[in-house]
């Protein structure tokens, strides 16, 4: 069985140790000969890499390991690039959230003006990594789960149309894990789903078990009362702010009881509620910096100090095993059915053919083959057309360095009440993003 060489782009991420543990747990399905970390923040990466090197020595000493800030070293001789980068780190995420909130607008990592700001920072970073991969390992595939996935996917479609990149998001997986629990199933893989939308902006229209029995009525009964709140939930989304999001799904569901919604629709359909329940001084970014970031870096430092993982509390990110499913589908032509973000090309009959949609695909050695979704209802179509236009305008603004188009993008977001407020937020975002955005004219 071939052994693979993998580079993790974003080696200094708080998610990296959990993903490394997950890869080690799946070595029987996806054997690795070489694992590399790449990051442009040497100090930050050194802490995570130092701990991961010890984890590897203990669990899989045969794997060759390297952490580097040198693109040539990182991207030469790799089969897969697994990318989770955060340009500007959590300090910039904090501003993405707090600046819009100052104006009474949703402040969120991937939705509204904050998501647009993050997108403007991320496009260049993801394109750069893609270019390194194509230069040094032209046969490799990039598995990208960097946020904001919708804008990043649109950017790769428009700016690098022939590149071997698969854009995937873990949010539907987290929700499906909860659905499986609500239904009393062992795993979300016992369900076959139909889902359509944009990234962080979609709906389940059909969910069946392996025998073809319709599971929607039972799920709807639960969601109508409790949202996606479940006993155990998924391992990824556990904080108090997430619990509110899963509970609020019942109100999002009520707007269209014929489908089951992605939780992120709360930000677009109930922005007033979101702002009202936000703390302008302490946002999700603060929660993460004080929670996961301190925890992960604290644990990594302990592992390095003890030169051992004994007593280490870092856990496998089990729900990240979708990354292995995707790599296996490409490597072994497994024809796994997965939700990916792909050009619509008529899959949704009555929607923009160039829009990047999130739909089920059959994945094999040549990449994804999107399934046909047919026509979608007017309500979803209307919301999606507005949102896909936001995403396209952001990418055009980045490419053309256009102030006008970015103002239009923010104005068009459902989360923003007027062009005046959009301009105020934009001008403040430009100030703080000088080191990250192209200079707009």
Swiss-Prot record:
UniProt: NAD(+) binding residues: 4-70
Group of enzyme by EC: hydrolase
Protein EC: 3.2.1.122
Pfam families assigned: Glyco_hydro_4 (PF02056), Glyco_hydro_4C (PF11975)
Subunit details: Homotetramer.
Binding site for Mn(2+): 169, 200
Active site per the UniProt annotation: 170 (proton donor), 264 (proton acceptor)
Residues with site note (Increases basicity of active site Tyr): 109
Keyword entries, A-Z: Carbohydrate metabolism, Glycosidase, Hydrolase, Manganese, Metal-binding, NAD
Induction: By maltose and other alpha-glucosides, except sucrose.
Known function: Catalyzes the hydrolysis of O-alpha-linked disaccharide 6-phosphates, including maltose-6'P and all five phosphorylated isomers of sucrose, but not sucrose-6P. Does not hydrolyze beta-linked disaccharide 6-phosphates such as cellobiose-6'P and gentiobiose-6'P. Is involved in the dissimilation of maltose and related O-alpha-linked glucosides produced via the phosphoenolpyruvate-dependent sugar phosphotransferase system (PEP-PTS).
The family this protein is said to belong to: Belongs to the glycosyl hydrolase 4 family.
Naturally occurring in which organism (per UniProt): Clostridium acetobutylicum (strain ATCC 824 / DSM 792 / JCM 1419 / IAM 19013 / LMG 5710 / NBRC 13948 / NRRL B-527 / VKM B-1787 / 2291 / W)
GO molecular function: maltose-6'-phosphate glucosidase activity; metal ion binding; oxidoreductase activity, acting on the CH-OH group of donors, NAD or NADP as acceptor
Gene3D superfamilies: Lactate dehydrogenase/glycoside hydrolase, family 4, C-terminal, NAD(P)-binding Rossmann-like Domain
Catalytic activity: alpha-maltose 6'-phosphate + H2O = D-glucose 6-phosphate + D-glucose
Cofactor note as given: Binds 1 NAD(+) per subunit.
List of residues binding substrate: 93, 147, 284
Protein name: Maltose-6'-phosphate glucosidase MalH
Cofactor names: NAD(+); Mn(2+)
An example Gene Ontology biological process: carbohydrate metabolic process
Top-level taxon of the source organism: Bacteria
CDD domains: GH4_GlvA_pagL_like
């Amino acid at each position: 069985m071939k052994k693979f060489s993998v580079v993790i782009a974003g080696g200094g991420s708080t998610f990296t140790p959990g993903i490394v543990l997950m890869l080690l747990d799946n070595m029987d399905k996806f054997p690795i000969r070489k694992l590399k970390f790449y990051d442009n923040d040497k100090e930050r990466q050194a802490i995570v890499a130092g701990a991961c090197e010890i984890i590897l020595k203990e669990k899989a000493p045969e794997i060759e390991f390297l952490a580097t800030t040198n693109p040539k070293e990182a991207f030469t001789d790799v089969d897969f690039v697994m990318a989770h980068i955060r340009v500007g780190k959590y300090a910039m995420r904090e501003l993405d959230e707090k600046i819009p909130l100052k104006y009474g607008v949703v402040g969120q990592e991937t939705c509204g003006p904050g998501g647009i700001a993050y997108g403007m920072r991320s496009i260049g970073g993801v394109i750069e990594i893609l270019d390194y991969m194509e230069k040094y390992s032209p046969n490799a595939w990039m598995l990208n789960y960097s946020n904001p996935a919708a804008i990043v996917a649109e950017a790769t479609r428009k700016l690098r149309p022939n590149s071997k990149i698969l854009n995937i998001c873990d949010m539907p997986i987290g929700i499906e894990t909860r659905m499986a629990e609500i239904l009393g199933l062992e795993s979300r893989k016992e369900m076959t789903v139909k889902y359509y939308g944009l990234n962080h902006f979609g709906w389940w229209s059909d969910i069946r078990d392996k025998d073809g029995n319709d599971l929607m009525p039972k799920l709807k009964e639960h969601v109508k009362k409790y949202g996606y709140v479940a006993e155990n939930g998924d391992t990824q989304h556990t904080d108090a702010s997430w619990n509110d999001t899963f509970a609020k799904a019942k109100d999002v569901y009520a707007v269209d009881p014929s489908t089951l919604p992605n939780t992120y629709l709360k930000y677009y359909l109930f922005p007033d509620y979101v702002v009202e329940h936000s703390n302008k001084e302490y946002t999700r970014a603060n929660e993460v910096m004080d929670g996961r970031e301190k925890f992960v870096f604290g644990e990594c430092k302990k592992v390095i100090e003890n030169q051992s993982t004994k007593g280490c509390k870092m856990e496998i990110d089990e729900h990240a095993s979708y990354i292995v499913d995707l790599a296996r589908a490409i490597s072994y032509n497994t024809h796994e059915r997965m939700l990916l973000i792909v050009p619509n090309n008529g899959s949704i009959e009555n929607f923009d053919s160039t829009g990047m949609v999130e739909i089920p695909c059959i994945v094999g050695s040549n990449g994804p083959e999107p399934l046909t979704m047919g026509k979608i209802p007017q309500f979803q179509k209307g919301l999606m057309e507005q949102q896909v236009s936001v995403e396209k305008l952001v990418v055009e603004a980045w490419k053309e360095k256009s102030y006008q188009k970015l103002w239009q993008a923010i104005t068009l977001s459902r989360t923003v009440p007027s062009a005046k407020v959009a301009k105020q937020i934009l001008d403040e975002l430009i100030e703080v993003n000088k080191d990250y955005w192209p200079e707009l004219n």
